[in-house]
């Protein structure tokens, strides 16, 4: 593990000049301001001003603050330490905790509290009382570890799997043959043994005796025979009655020749992962409403017998119910939902036979599984929570369901950032051996799309999972990942997360294997309030108004279900989302690069969409157009509704071609004819591969092979801040204007007039990092577009608030350019843009470990403290203070910028004895003009805080035992053993 250092480049003061924004007619020019000029020259004349409150920062509410997953290791908690943990989080700016009990700590078994026991509920009640005093929100996991399950789940309610045994029948009339299977998979080999029989047996009495005993010994106590299909040698099929089986033996006439397929409902036997005491046991069957009802009874009992309140929300983690591809009720539910008997198509379900029939049967199976998960788990679980005054927060990814429908059925859809994104931001330290982020923008948008379309107020995220190796997560690295979440519609972030730790526990305290360690044992925790204030400011804007993405993008789920090969069981795991529908994933990124934003929509959600007042209207948002991208397979009902919307005035666009195939097997030819008939009614030529557009009722249908040409017909104006300047953005509609959150997530800067796609009478800028706000410099171009002057460096972000009416008065948001600094150097006078802070620095170790006394001198530029020749310096974790006295030249400057270049990791600044701010994110710079004395001697103190990496490396080098946790204990981002002694 590399040692963390202080900096790599010289610390410099940069003189900056305010730029005067000169507006003349419809053209805009820039000129440097003199020292006496200020931004007042760009003042907007007051007119009917918007409400004053709209130009202020929103008041911060609890839900604006970030939350954190709070792991209770072994539930070995006590009231005193619970209070200390909560108070620490509150002081750091955390607004919500989600209690998730997990495995325990070695040697602390006496402190463990069984899940939902009276003692556990007493601890929950204490947390709720303390949280109420601190104005914090308390959520809780719907189980321990993940997925849902535990000791009350017996095999009858446990997660289930397909189990198939196959028996070749040779057909014999000479003797009674006993046939048995030797394994329990779909590719089983079989053996045939003949039992003795007397010569007096007649031909008609000869039987084939099939031994149906399950060969997998682990499954024998649980497997339930569900179907017997005889496939004759001529291809004919017969479903045999289960009643014919006696003591695991099925007798068939000796002359039957072909194959017998036996289908069982087996059990995955998966245990709850990372379970806490009292939560150990089998994983429940998420496809069974009966199993869910049985599972939830334990919560009803625990809360009825306790004074604890029901939590604000119950949480369900990503779907990791491995291999649960069956359920006792599946055959019957399939028959009711798909209108045919799946038993007759077991070979196709197993991937054998006509490829088209295989695809259609597998599609029907996948759709049925998806509906069962929605109808038997997600919806009733949410209804159960509502009946108790709670909500549901759920991660649908990883499941076999239609993610959009699952997310829409819960109260707070939650996505997940997993790994580290390569943003290519200057001076941002990113370790080489890191796991790349699987939660790319196209994947993150499933949760927020469902929230927007269905009208949910919040989209949450499990944030920063495996962002770095342990002890390596900087605030600077967190910020762009958070910005990426905001840009994709997340407005309620939860850290991953906070291990509960007793105050008296030896450092590094109690740890969770995939945590970024949001607690006081992390050195950087002292500066987390700055990050959390930033998050709260952003979320205060992003939780208000309505989404304004304008384009609906149809998710061609049936193309995936019907055409995606591999096994019949298909899940949407975050790590491989792009593999399932790469064209769709690529299209989303291409649209966004072109300056557009969108929400995805499912067939079910589309059926609830209306067209009125010139817009497509869903329960939660309004849109200008809908696009069906590269879709081959579509139910006639979906196309029928699209055409209904077009007749009423909607613009429906098809990219590439139009869908001409229907999903599923039942009455496929009849439904295909319905689809063709619908196309014939439109007048579109479905075999034409060039752009075409037809009027349809009051609306328009457009087909185009080229995305850019298609979007020109959409009536949607792209945002040039993205397509030209490279700024990422998300936009929300307020009653009196719009709100943009913009961020530069690439290695480029913006210093230009930038048009807004939405009209505005006036604009405010809000800087969520500093809390600064002011009216925006505005102008118009030749196309009469609103222009605002944006000056944004890599890593920076901004909130843009527009108003439909009224003008704003006051100094506009400052725009700076570097100025020249004249200073003496060996009788010479040099003019430079930067003044290096060099001289006689002093340094001392402040708050941290190990304790290192004394003051150290550094000449010239300050050096990393790891270079000091003093025992313990290379193991130190905490804060060190650098001090310097220097004379500031008396030059013409409107402000001064302190530029660190590189910083590891945060720096608190004091100028002339006054707190001047905290530097913690890229670019590592801060304005100091209000604190400096031009032409006089000044003092600067820089309190730098590093990460715990050096200290934990020292622990490993010295063999100190700190890995004291059960289950998985501590592993690397790749789930491999790891030491930090390098």
Region spans (language model):
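Carbohydrate-binding surfaces of carbohydrate-active enzymes
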Residues: 82-83, 96, 113-146, 152-153, ...
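Extended acidic/polar, glycine-enriched regions
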Residues: 216-304, 780-833
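Short acidic/polar inter-strand loop motif in beta-rich domains
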Residues: 269, 806-808, 945-954
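Aromatic-lined ligand-binding clefts that engage carbohydrates, nucleic acids, or primary amines
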Residues: 755, 886-912, 919, 940-944
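Bacterial N-terminal signal peptides
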Residues: 10-22
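Short, surface-exposed tryptophan/glycine-enriched loops
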Residues: 926-937, 943-948
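Acidic/aromatic-lined carbohydrate-recognition and catalytic surfaces
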Residues: 102-187, 201-242, 252, 260-266, ...
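Mature N-terminal segment immediately following signal peptide/propeptide cleavage
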Residues: 49-96
């Amino acid at each position: 593990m590399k040692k963390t250092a202080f900096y790599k480049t010289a610390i410099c003061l940069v003189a900056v000049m305010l730029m005067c924004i000169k507006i003349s007619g419809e053209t805009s020019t820039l000129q440097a301001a003199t020292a006496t000029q200020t931004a007042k020259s760009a003042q907007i004349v007051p007119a009917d001003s918007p409400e004053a409150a709209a130009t202020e920062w929103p008041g911060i509410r609890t839900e604006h603050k970030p939350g954190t997953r709070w792991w209770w290791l072994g539930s070995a908690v006590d009231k005193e330490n619970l209070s200390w943990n909560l108070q620490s989080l509150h002081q750091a700016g955390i607004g919500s905790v989600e209690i998730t009990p997990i495995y325990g700590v070695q040697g602390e078994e006496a402190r463990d509290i069984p899940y939902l026991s009276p003692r556990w509920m007493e601890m929950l009640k204490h947390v709720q009382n303390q949280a109420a005093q601190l104005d914090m929100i308390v959520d809780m996991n719907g189980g321990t570890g993940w997925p849902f399950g535990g000791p009350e789940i017996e095999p009858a309610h446990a997660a289930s799997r397909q189990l198939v045994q196959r028996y070749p029948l040779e057909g014999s009339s000479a003797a009674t043959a006993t046939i048995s299977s030797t394994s329990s998979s779909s590719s089983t080999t079989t053996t045939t043994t003949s039992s003795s029989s007397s010569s007096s047996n007649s031909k008609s009495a000869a039987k084939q005796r099939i031994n149906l005993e399950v060969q997998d010994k682990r499954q024998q106590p649980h497997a339930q025979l569900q179907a017997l299909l005889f496939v004759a040698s001529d291809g004919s099929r017969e479903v045999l009655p289960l009643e014919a089986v006696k003591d695991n033996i099925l007798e068939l006439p000796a002359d039957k020749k072909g194959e017998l397929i036996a289908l069982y409902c087996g059990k995955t036997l998966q245990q709850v992962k990372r379970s806490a005491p009292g939560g150990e046991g089998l994983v429940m069957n998420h496809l069974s409403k009966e199993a869910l009802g049985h599972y939830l009874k334990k919560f009803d009992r625990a809360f009825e017998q306790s004074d604890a309140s029901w939590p604000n929300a119950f949480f369900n983690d990503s779907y990791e119910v491995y291999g649960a591809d069956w359920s006792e009720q599946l055959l019957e539910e399939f028959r009711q939902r798909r209108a045919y008997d799946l038993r007759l198509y077991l070979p196709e379900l197993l991937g054998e036979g006509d490829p088209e029939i295989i695809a259609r049967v597998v599609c029907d199976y996948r759709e049925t599984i998806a509906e069962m998960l929605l109808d038997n788990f997600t919806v009733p679980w949410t209804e159960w929570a509502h009946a108790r005054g709670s909500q549901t927060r759920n991660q649908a990814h990883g499941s076999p369901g239609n993610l959009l429908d699952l997310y829409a059925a819960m109260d707070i859809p939650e996505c997940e950032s997993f790994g580290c994104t390569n943003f290519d931001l200057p001076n941002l330290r990113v370790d080489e051996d890191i796991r790349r982020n699987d939660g790319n923008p196209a994947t993150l948008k499933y949760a927020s799309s469902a929230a927007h379309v269905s009208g949910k107020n919040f989209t949450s995220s499990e944030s920063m999972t495996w962002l770095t190796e342990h002890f390596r997560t900087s605030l600077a690295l967190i910020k762009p990942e958070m910005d990426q979440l905001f840009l994709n519609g997340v407005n309620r972030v939860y850290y991953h997360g906070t291990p509960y730790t007793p105050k008296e526990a030896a450092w590094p305290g109690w740890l969770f294997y995939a945590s970024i360690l949001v607690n006081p044992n992390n050195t950087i925790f002292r500066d987390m309030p700055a990050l959390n204030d930033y998050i709260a400011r952003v979320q205060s804007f992003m939780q208000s108004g309505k989404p304004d993405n304008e384009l609906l993008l149809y998710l061609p789920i049936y193309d995936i279900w019907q055409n995606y090969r591999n096994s019949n069981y298909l899940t949407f795991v975050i790590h491989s989302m792009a593999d399932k529908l790469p064209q769709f994933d690529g299209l989303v990124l291409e649209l966004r690069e072109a300056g557009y934003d969108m929400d995805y929509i499912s067939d079910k959600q589309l059926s609830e969409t209306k067209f009125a007042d010139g817009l497509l209207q869903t329960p939660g948002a309004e849109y200008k157009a809908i696009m069906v991208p590269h879709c081959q397979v579509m139910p006639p009902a979906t196309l029928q509704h699209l055409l209904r919307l077009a007749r009423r005035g909607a613009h429906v666009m098809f990219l590439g071609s139009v869908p001409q195939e229907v999903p599923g097997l039942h009455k496929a030819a009849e439904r295909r004819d319905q689809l063709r008939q619908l196309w014939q009614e439109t007048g579109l030529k479905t075999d034409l591969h060039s752009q075409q557009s037809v009027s349809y009722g009051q609306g328009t249908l457009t087909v185009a092979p080229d995305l850019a040409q298609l979007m020109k017909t959409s009536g949607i104006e792209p945002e040039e801040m993205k397509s030209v300047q490279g700024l990422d953005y998300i936009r929300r509609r307020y009653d009196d204007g719009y709100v943009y959150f913009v961020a530069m997530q690439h290695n480029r800067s913006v210093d230009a007039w930038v048009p807004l796609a939405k009209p505005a009478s006036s604009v405010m800028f809000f800087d969520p990092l500093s809390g600064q706000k002011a009216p925006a410099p505005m102008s118009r171009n030749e196309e009469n577009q609103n222009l605002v002057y944006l000056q944004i460096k890599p890593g920076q972000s901004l909130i843009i608030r527009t108003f439909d009416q009224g003008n704003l008065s006051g100094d506009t948001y400052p725009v700076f350019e570097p100025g020249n600094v004249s200073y003496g150097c060996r009788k010479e006078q040099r003019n430079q843009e930067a003044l290096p802070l060099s001289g006689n620095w002093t340094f001392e170790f402040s708050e941290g470990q190990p304790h290192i006394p004394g003051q150290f001198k550094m000449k010239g530029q300050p050096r990393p403290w790891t270079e000091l020749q003093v025992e313990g310096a290379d193991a130190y974790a905490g804060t060190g203070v650098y001090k310097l006295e220097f004379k500031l030249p008396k030059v013409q400057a409107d402000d001064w910028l302190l530029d660190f270049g590189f910083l590891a990791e945060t720096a608190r600044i004091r100028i002339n004895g006054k707190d001047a701010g905290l530097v913690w994110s890229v670019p590592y710079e801060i304005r100091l003009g209000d604190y400096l004395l031009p032409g006089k001697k000044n003092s600067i103190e820089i309190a730098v805080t590093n990460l715990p990496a050096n200290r934990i490396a020292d622990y490993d080098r010295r063999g100190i035992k700190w890995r004291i946790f059960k289950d998985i204990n501590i592993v690397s981002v790749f789930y491999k053993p790891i030491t930090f002694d390098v």
